[in-house]
Design a protein with these regions (language model features):
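N-terminal pre-P-loop "Q-motif" helix
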Residues: 2-11, 148-173
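N-terminal accessory nucleic-acid engagement/regulatory domains that precede
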Residues: 68-141
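Pre-Walker A (Motif I) flank of P-loop NTPase domains
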Residues: 19-24, 170-176
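Long, charged/polar, low-complexity intrinsically disordered N-terminal extensions
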Residues: 4-9, 14-43, 49
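Short, hydrophobic beta-strand segments that form beta-sheet elements in well-ordered domains
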Residues: 26, 45-54, 62-64, 105-107, ...
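A short, well-structured beta->alpha microelement
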Residues: 5-12, 52-72
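Walker A/P-loop nucleotide-binding motif
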Residues: 29-32, 177-184
Length: 184
C-alpha cells in the first residue's frame, strides 16, 4: 500500500508543479482501494477533497453518486469518484468541473469483466487514464510539461480591471460579461 500511496503523492506534486490535472484509476478489490485511499489521505494536509459516491471521509466533502451537481461552483484538489456500482455521466461531468489545475481525479472501478456494451466502453475510457491495478506493477509516468501560468489568465485580469472601472467610474453604466465556457 505504501508504494501506491507514495506514487499518488509523487504524481500529485508533479501535477501541481506542471499545473495539469491528472486522472488515476484504482482497479482492484474494495479493501485494497480503501487502504490506498486512507494512506494517501493521511499525506494530504492542505488539499481539499471532494467525493462522489458512497464515501464518508471526515476531512472531505462527500455527496451521493447522483449529486455531483452539488459541487458546481466549488473547487477541489482531489476528486474521488466511485464507479464500482454505477456510473452517472451527468454527475461525473458536473463534479469534474470542480477540479483545479494541478488537481487529481481518483476513480474506483471493479475488477469484474464488464457485462454490457456501455460498461465495456466505459472500461476502455478508464484505461486512457493512469491505471493502478491490484497485484500489478506501478506504471511509469513521463514528466509533465510545465504550463505557463502567468499567461493563462490575461483575459480574466482584463475583465476584472473593466469591472473595477465600472464600479469606480463616474457614470452609472451596465456591465455585460460573457464567457465561451461555463466557468470563465
Amino acid at each position: 500500500m505504501h508504494a501506491q500511496s507514495e506514487f499518488l503523492s509523487s504524481l500529485q506534486r508533479q501535477s501541481q508543479h506542471a499545473f495539469q490535472r491528472s486522472g488515476v484509476v484504482l482497479q482492484g478489490e474494495a479493501d485494497w482501494q480503501e487502504a490506498i485511499l486512507s494512506a494517501f489521505l493521511q499525506t494530504q494536509t492542505t488539499q481539499r477533497w471532494f467525493c462522489v459516491g458512497d464515501w464518508s471521509f471526515e476531512s472531505a466533502f462527500c455527496v451521493g453518486m447522483k449529486q455531483g451537481n452539488r459541487l458546481l461552483g466549488r473547487e477541489c484538489d482531489v476528486l474521488l469518484f466511485d464507479a464500482r456500482k454505477e456510473f452517472d455521466a451527468n454527475s461525473f461531468t458536473a463534479a469534474i468541473g470542480s477540479l483545479v489545475g494541478g488537481g487529481m481525479l481518483l476513480v474506483m472501478t471493479n475488477t469484474a469483466q464488464p457485462q454490457h456494451f456501455a460498461e465495456q466502453w466505459m472500461q476502455t475510457q478508464w484505461q486512457k487514464l493512469i491505471v493502478l491495478e491490484q497485484g500489478k506493477v506501478i506504471p511509469q509516468v513521463s514528466e509533465l510539461a510545465i504550463a505557463q501560468r502567468n499567461t493563462e489568465y490575461i483575459e480574466q485580469t482584463h475583465a476584472v480591471s473593466l469591472i473595477e472601472k465600472v464600479v469606480n467610474g463616474h457614470r452609472k453604466r451596465p456591465l455585460v460579461l460573457t464567457a465561451d465556457r461555463g466557468r470563465g
